[in-house]
Amino acid sequence: MDASRDIGSFVVWDYVVFAGMLLISAAIGIYYAFAGGGQQTSKDFLMGGRSMSAVPVALSLTASFMSAVTVLGTPAEVYRFGAIFSIFVITYFFVVVISAEVFLPVFYRLGITSTYEYLELRFNRCIRLCGTILFIVQTILYTGIVIYAPALALNQVTGFDLWGAVVATGVVCTFYCTLGGLKAVVWTDVFQVGIMVAGFASVIIQASITQHGINKILSDAFNGGRLNFWNFDPNPLQRHTFWTIVIGGTFTWTTIYGVNQSQVQRYISCKSRLHAKLSLYVNLVGLWVILTCSIFCGLALYSRYRECDPWTSKKVSAIDQLMPYLVLDILKNYPGVPGLFVACAYSGTLSTVSSSINALAAVTVEDLIKPRFKSLSEKSLSWISQGMSVLYGALCIGMAALASLMGALLQAALSIFGMVGGPLLGLFSLGILVPFANSIGALTGLLAGFAISLWVGIGAQLYPPLPERTLPLPLETYGCNITHNGSDWMSTTEMPFSTSAFQIHNAERTPLMDNWYSLSYLYFSTIGTLTTLFVGILISLSTGGRKQNLDPRFLLTKQDFLSNFDVFKKRNHVLNYKLHPVEVGGTDNPAFNHVELNFTDHSGKINGTRL
């Protein structure tokens, strides 16, 4: 394949498609600013009035999980390392089941808005503040990178204006988050996940035509060693094996679906626990669809460039730029379609950023403002929540600008963001699964988990694993035209995700570097979680944890699992009451109701509350 292939460039119709995606997203925000009386209370703004249905929430969960980093990065991952990444279909299943059956029942029962409220209810306010502040710092940092990274990759390949895209993304997200609250975020995500699927579909269809069929793409991938689905090597130092993806990946992504405010806030906004669980399980199908699309795009990349790798031949300066390069290569004769793919990538960015802004506003209001200013009315809290959305939107845009100056530190920042999730998962698991865990054990376990996960993570940045541990597959350039005719425009600065400036070169390799620091990155969260649990349990036992009298609402109980089967019981039985009757004339919060609702009447409602 000739590397001098004439690829296309962005035209007016591509910009029109991209602008249309932004305008529709903004219009959804305007609609939900006024629909149903607008955002009258903080609960309306932050939780959608706790009236959301399963399907839109499921699509929102999928959209916000699959950022532009996924749209651009996963196909490049498959191109470089093979389709073993597809084992994540198993990982996603475990993640969703754990989130739905372990964490959701407790969070939904308590009726909380901020995930970190649980930490105060279960332990103390100090631990709650630790979790809140850590989440705020991490999320601002990560969101800025999510805005900047895909903008840079697309700019260097397509010529798409870098800062125009960064500012437009940040402003539009802030606009519809501020006006429409969680409902706008969810329904915009529904629209954006459709754009993501359409963008992937356009690439898959045209790649299949260009490469003469799906069978040809799969045949090329097989001959090139890309269909490496099964690697059962138990060595934890290998970057991706079946075990690192299933075990390490489950811990890594449960930190997001199980305890991260951005995701938890969505499913506990559902109108019933059944809808909340359904949203997670329907979302699983969405995750599988998006992953399948991105895996196939990676195989199409290899089929197209198996004889002349654009990265090795300097046609692109970073592996993340391969998907935009492919789009301009195979879709150059279809004006507007390359713009659809850019809209696909930015839909991932918009969904992630909007979810982050809404979650940041929620934890700030619930964890930092309401406890200190208890006299504030719901209307005032709603206005404050909107103000927080504006503030955090501006901070995320500012972080994107700062990201452009950080260079090699970006990868370290992203890695640290992933590492701190493990100890937090361990902290929540300690509270929900260990009845005798106390605040001393929780805080000590959290600190120990952070220390060990940061140690291995930062060490891996300073002394990265050797190539034989990462198992990159060979890339060929024998089919390239060495004259590189017309390719000067592709000479760009290197993507800042290379950590070369942050690494210590020419250092003598020690056993610590070749073993501890070479651990698969997917095990960082695993180590943090298990360390937090182990130390937390040990310290709790030695500091009188068994003597505490704990409210069972804060724990996962057998009834939480058995209640899944209540749907099969007849619904015409009489209610069984506990000793505490409902007061006449009051409207009870179902999360704190003293009535044990074993069965419902024929209407399916109790005191106006739909089950």
Curated annotation (Swiss-Prot):
Gene name of the encoded protein: Slc5a8
Main location: membrane
Transmembrane segments: 10-30, 52-72, 87-107, 133-153, 162-182, 185-205, 240-260, 280-300, 337-359, 390-410, 416-436, 440-460, 519-539
Cytoplasmic compartment spans: 31-51, 108-132, 183-184, 261-279, 360-389, 437-439, 540-611
Bilayer topology term: Multi-pass membrane protein
Cellular compartments annotated: Apical cell membrane
NCBIfam families in UniProt: sss
Gene Ontology BP terms: acetate transport; apoptotic process; chloride transport; iodide transport; monocarboxylic acid transport; nicotinate transport; nitrate transmembrane transport; propanoate transmembrane transport
UniProt note on regulation of activity: Transport of D-lactate and pyruvate stimulated by alpha-cyano-4-hydroxycinnamic acid, but inhibited by the short-chain fatty acids acetate, propionate and butyrate.
Tissue/organ expression: Expressed in brain, colon, kidney and in the ileum and jejunum of small intestine. In the kidney, expression occurred in the proximal tubule and the loop of Henle, being restricted to tubular epithelial cells in both the cortex and the medulla. In the colon, predominantly expressed in the distal half of the large bowel and in the most terminal ileum. Localized selectively in the luminal surface of crypts in the large intestine and to the brush border in the middle parts of crypts in the cecum.
Family (UniProt): Belongs to the sodium:solute symporter (SSF) (TC 2.A.21) family.
Binding partners and assembly: Interacts (via PDZ-binding motif) with PDZK1 (via PDZ domains 1 and 3); interaction increases nicotinate transport activity of SLC5A8.
UniProt keyword list: Apoptosis, Cell membrane, Glycoprotein, Ion transport, Membrane, Sodium, Sodium transport, Symport, Transmembrane, Transmembrane helix, Transport, Tumor suppressor
GO (cellular component) term, any one: brush border membrane
Gene3D superfamilies, per database record: Sodium/glucose cotransporter
Residue span of motif PDZ-binding: 609-611
Glycosylation sites noted in the Swiss-Prot or TrEMBL record: N485
Name of protein: Sodium-coupled monocarboxylate transporter 1
Molecular function GO terms recorded: lactate transmembrane transporter activity; monocarboxylate:sodium symporter activity; organic acid:sodium symporter activity; propionate transmembrane transporter activity; short-chain fatty acid transmembrane transporter activity
Function statement: Acts as an electrogenic sodium (Na(+)) and chloride (Cl-)-dependent sodium-coupled solute transporter, including transport of monocarboxylates (short-chain fatty acids including L-lactate, D-lactate, pyruvate, acetate, propionate, valerate and butyrate), mocarboxylate drugs (nicotinate, benzoate, salicylate and 5-aminosalicylate) and ketone bodies (beta-D-hydroxybutyrate, acetoacetate and alpha-ketoisocaproate), with a Na(+):substrate stoichiometry of between 4:1 and 2:1. Catalyzes passive carrier mediated diffusion of iodide.
Protein's organism: Mus musculus
Catalytically driven reaction(s): (S)-lactate(out) + 2 Na(+)(out) = (S)-lactate(in) + 2 Na(+)(in); propanoate(out) + 2 Na(+)(out) = propanoate(in) + 2 Na(+)(in); pyruvate(out) + 2 Na(+)(out) = pyruvate(in) + 2 Na(+)(in); acetate(out) + 2 Na(+)(out) = acetate(in) + 2 Na(+)(in)
All ranges on the Extracellular side of the membrane: 1-9, 73-86, 154-161, 206-239, 301-336, 411-415, 461-518
